[in-house]
Amino acid sequence: MVIFLYISDNTVRKLLKDAGAGRTSKEARNELKRYLDKKAFEIAQKAVKLSHHAKRKTVDISDIKLAIS
């Protein structure tokens, strides 16, 4: 099992608060954090592959948008 540590607990806490959650459990925050970390990493990997395929060293917005779609 790969553990990603890109998105901070404070970021997830703020996201949930802004979405209307008054209180959140640590388990709930950790689960959302794991999901968001994994999805962000997968998108980043796809974007890098797309930029390499286009023979570019720089990942640009079109790579990210295509990786998300």
Q: What is the predicted function of each stretch?
A:
Residues M1-S69:
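Intrinsically disordered, low-complexity terminal regions
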